[in-house]
Amino acid sequence: MSIKHYDVVRAASPSDLAEKLTHKLKEGWQPFGSPVAITPYTLMQAIAAEGDVTTPVLVKPSDGEGTVISATRDPEYYFVVVLAGQSNSMAYGEGLPLPETYDRPDPRIKQLARRSTVTPGGVACKYNDIIPADHCLHDVQDMSRLNHPKADLSKGQYGTVGQGLHIAKKLLPFIPANAGILLVPCCRGGSAFTTGADGTYSDASGASENSTRWGVDKPLYKDLIGRTKAALKKNPKNVLFAVVWMQGEFDFGGTPANHAAQFGAQVDKFRADLADMAGQCVGGSADGVPWICGDTTYFWKQKNESSYQTVYGSYKNKTEKNIHFVPFMTDE
């Protein structure tokens, strides 16, 4: 056969290898040779593809230095996942980015642009362009200027680390092979409903970086709904899949008792404002789009137990409204 792409699959056991190969076969790959045990705990299987595939392919540049990702095929349409809230929902991870391995981008995972370049000093982009997603997404607060002290910027280890890329990677096996994930980052560290500065909003650039106040028709909300609609308008086949929301700590110092009502009003307004695009929402209506509300860390939970129960407790028991709380840890 005429091989266009090569890659390898690593696994910890025969069953793990079989599961991973099943996914690869669906993506257009074929086994190339037999599996090899490279350590007592690691199996490796070479794979190859004659045509386009839907996963990233590692290739060496002609000078033999470094590793880059070869684009294969752009998705025909996207499942849109909106990321919103405060620091827990964005790139506040202080660890060293690993863009060649663990934080490796995937050509099926994109994001809506906000900054003027895809990466610091990189390719130019405009607000709401579709660009590759990596470990440091284009949120309201720009974290790309903060680098780990041991970062090698020549390897793309710029900025801080978020979980958006990894949420999308978890979803890829469950969507059609010709589809991708389009992330819409709208997070701002330190933001709240009951305290903080409104900031400003522009259709041309979104919410200003000093915007730290959520609520109906606040600049952060306008950024959220505006970018969500922009993502859907990119392609009539795009589908709004979910809103991943993580927010609450900064309301501990505001008026915690008012948080639940303001959050609920914002969800209702978001869904009402999407009524004209219901056909592009999962389930055929804006009410069908789940809000996935993440927990806070143990530190905040322990330090502010009463306020925690008021704010984060309000996310619980709302499944009938398609609002789902995901605990950071299981209560004993």
Task: Describe the role of every protein-language-model region.
Residues 59-332:
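Cell-envelope and extracellular/periplasmic
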Residues 1-62:
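Terminus-proximal functional modules
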